[in-house]
Swiss-Prot record:
SMART domains: DUF3700 (SM01172). It comes from Nicotiana tabacum (Common tobacco). This is Stem-specific protein TSJT1. InterPro entries: DUF3700 (IPR024286), Ntn_hydrolases_N (IPR029055), TSJT1-like (IPR044828). PANTHER family: ALUMINUM INDUCED PROTEIN WITH YGL AND LRDR MOTIFS, STEM-SPECIFIC PROTEIN TSJT1. Stem-specific (active at lower levels in other organs).
Length: 149
């Protein structure tokens, strides 16, 4: 999974940084260079180009059958999901989704419900999830990026 937005990279706390002794810093790659590197590395990748040169990409290469990857776009909300939820039945029932709804669809619906209909922050979605997963969710209307692992 890969998502590139805007021109900045988050800085980790100093406690999580690697020692820089003797390491020369390389100049940061552009979004286009990152996309080309990913395409070269994962030739079967699928790209979703968003506004302002931003993009999301994923590949099924080397996919673990127990942790499948999927992507869905619903109502201008893009979601790349990797892994599996252990409580999909309960979540589908809670959000009124069909049995065919994938984990990515569940994530988008859960995000939209909390965003639109409840006075809760979107990170409340995480509390309901059980399983081993990671996702990148981008709401293009609200320009909101939400990810979890």
């Amino acid at each position: 999974m890969l998502a590139v937005f805007e021109q900045s990279i988050g800085r980790p706390p100093p406690e999580l940084s690697l020692p820089q002794a003797g390491i020369q810093k390389k100049e940061a790659k552009t979004r286009e260079e990152i996309a080309e590197s990913f395409k070269t590395w994962k030739q079967d990748s699928t790209f979703y180009h968003l506004f302002n040169g931003n993009f999301m990409a994923f590949s099924h290469g080397n996919e673990n059958p127990l942790q499948p990857r999927s992507i869905v776009v619903m109502d201008d909300v893009f979601c790349i999901f990797s892994g599996a939820l252990d409580n999909t039945f309960d979540l589908r029932k809670h959000y009124g989704l069909s049995r065919q709804a994938t984990e990515a669809m569940i994530m988008v619906e859960a995000y939209k419900v909390l965003r639109d209909r409840a006075p809760y922050p979107p990170d409340q979605v995480i509390k309901e999830l059980e399983g081993k997963f990671a996702f990148i969710l981008f709401d293009s209307k609200a320009s909101t990026l939400f990810l979890a692992r």
